[in-house]
C-alpha cells in the first residue's frame, strides 16, 4: 500500500452531497476525501447509490446540492457545475464502450482529444500506455477482434492516456467470466498503481474490495456508513450492519459484564466495546476466530465443543460444532482425525465485537 507516499492535501473532496430523482433522495449528505495515489472502492449492493455518486463526480449526473472539489478547484457547487470534459477525469464502464470503427491505437488516441495520435509527443504517450496496459501488440486490431478482457484493457488505456487527475471505474470487471476477471483485475490495478494514478472503483464484490482497495466506502441506501482501510472495516467496524456486510459472521445476543467482557450463549468472551453506556446488545464473531488448535497466539477464550458434522473441501475442512447448545461452523486448514460426536476444546482468537 502506498499511503505513506501520499501528500496530505486531498485530491478529491466531496462535501454534503445530496441527489434527488423527483421526490426520491438517492444520495444522503455524502462527504469524503481521496488522497493522491489512493485507490478507493465504493462497495454496496445494487441500487444503493454508488454508481449515481460516481456519475456525479464525473459530471454525468448533477447533484441537488453540496460541493465537489478536485485538487483546490471547485467542480460542482451552488450555481456552478463544471462540464464533464473540463474536469480532467477518466471514466471506464462495465464493457469498455470502444469506438467500433477505430483500431486500438486510435481508440487510445481519442482519449488525447483528436483520435489521431500523429505527432511525436502523442505517439510516445500512446506507446507508453499500451506497454503499461499490456496491449502493445494489439495496436492495429479493431474492437470486434478483441476479447472482453482486451477491450477492458484498451478502455483503461484510453482513460489513462491524457494523464487524468482521477480515474472512475464503474464495475469494470463484472462482464467478464470469473477466471478472466481475476486476471484482468490484477493487471489493470497493477497498471493503475504503476502509473501513480488515483482511482475510485464501484463494486458489489466484497472480496475484490478487501483485496485491492487502499480504502473502502460502505454505501447503503445512498449513505456512506463508514470509510476506512479494508483491515479496519473487517476487524473493527463502527456499526453492526457494516460488520455483517464485510464478511461471514456469528451474531449473538449478549450482555456486558464489564467494559472489556460480555456474556453470551457461548460463554464469557473478551470484547472490543462499541457501546458507550448500554449493557445489552449483540456480539459479533468471525468463523475464522475459532480453531481446534493452539497457536503461537494465546487464545482469548476456551470452550468445550462437540462435533456435529464434517465436510471435507480439499485444502480446508468445514466442521459444525455445538458449544453450550449453540451450533457454529468453523473452517480448519489442517484437521486431525475427527469423528462426529467427538468432544474437544475449541479456541477463540481475537476479541469479539460488542454493539448495543
Report each predicted region and the residues it spans.
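The feature captures the beta-strand-to-loop junction immediately N-terminal to the Walker
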Residues: 43-45
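ABC ATPase nucleotide-binding domain helices that frame the ATP-binding cleft
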Residues: 51-54, 154
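Helix-to-loop junction immediately C-terminal to a conserved catalytic motif
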Residues: 58
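Conserved ABC transporter NBD signature motif
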Residues: 66-77
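ABC ATPase nucleotide-binding domains
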Residues: 88-90, 94, 98-241
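Non-catalytic connector elements of ABC transporters
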Residues: 249, 260-356
Amino acid at each position: 500500500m502506498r499511503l505513506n507516499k501520499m501528500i496530505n492535501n486531498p485530491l478529491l473532496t466531496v462535501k454534503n452531497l445530496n441527489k434527488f430523482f423527483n421526490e426520491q433522495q438517492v444520495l444522503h449528505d455524502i462527504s469524503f476525501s481521496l488522497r493522491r495515489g489512493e485507490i478507493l472502492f465504493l462497495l454496496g449492493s445494487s441500487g444503493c447509490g454508488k454508481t449515481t455518486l460516481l456519475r456525479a463526480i464525473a459530471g454525468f449526473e448533477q447533484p441537488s446540492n453540496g460541493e465537489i472539489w478536485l485538487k483546490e478547484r471547485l467542480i460542482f457547487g451552488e450555481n456552478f457545475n463544471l462540464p464533464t470534459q473540463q474536469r480532467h477525469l477518466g471514466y471506464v464502464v462495465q464493457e469498455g464502450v470502444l469506438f467500433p470503427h477505430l483500431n486500438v491505437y486510435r481508440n487510445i488516441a481519442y482519449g488525447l482529444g483528436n483520435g489521431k495520435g500523429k505527432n511525436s509527443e502523442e505517439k510516445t504517450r500512446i506507446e507508453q500506455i499500451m506497454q503499461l496496459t499490456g496491449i502493445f501488440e494489439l495496436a492495429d486490431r479493431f474492437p470486434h477482434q478483441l476479447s472482453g478482457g482486451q477491450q477492458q484493457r484498451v478502455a483503461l488505456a484510453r482513460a489513462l492516456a491524457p494523464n487524468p487527475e482521477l480515474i472512475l471505474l464503474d464495475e469494470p470487471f463484472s462482464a467478464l467470466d470469473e477466471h478472466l476477471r481475476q486476471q484482468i483485475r490484477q493487471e489493470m490495478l497493477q497498471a493503475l498503481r504503476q502509473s501513480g494514478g488515483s482511482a475510485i472503483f464501484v463494486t458489489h464484490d466484497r472480496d475484490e474490495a478487501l483485496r485491492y482497495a487502499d480504502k473502502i466506502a460502505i454505501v447503503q441506501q445512498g449513505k456512506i456508513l463508514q470509510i476506512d482501510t479494508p483491515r479496519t472495516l473487517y476487524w473493527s467496524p463502527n456499526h453492526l450492519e457494516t460488520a455483517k456486510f464485510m464478511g461471514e459472521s456469528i451474531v449473538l445476543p449478549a450482555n456486558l459484564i464489564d467494559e472489556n467482557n460480555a456474556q453470551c450463549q457461548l460463554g464469557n468472551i473478551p470484547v472490543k466495546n462499541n457501546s458507550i453506556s448500554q449493557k445489552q446488545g449483540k456480539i459479533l464473531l468471525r468463523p475464522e476466530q475459532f480453531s481446534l488448535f493452539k497457536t503461537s497466539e494465546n487464545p482469548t477464550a476456551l470452550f468445550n465443543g462437540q462435533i456435529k458434522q464434517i465436510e471435507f473441501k480439499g485444502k480446508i475442512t468445514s466442521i459444525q460444532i455445538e458449544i453450550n447448545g449453540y451450533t457454529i461452523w468453523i473452517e480448519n486448514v489442517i484437521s486431525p482425525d475427527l469423528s462426529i460426536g467427538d468432544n474437544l476444546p475449541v479456541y477463540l482468537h481475537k476479541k469479539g465485537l460488542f454493539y448495543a
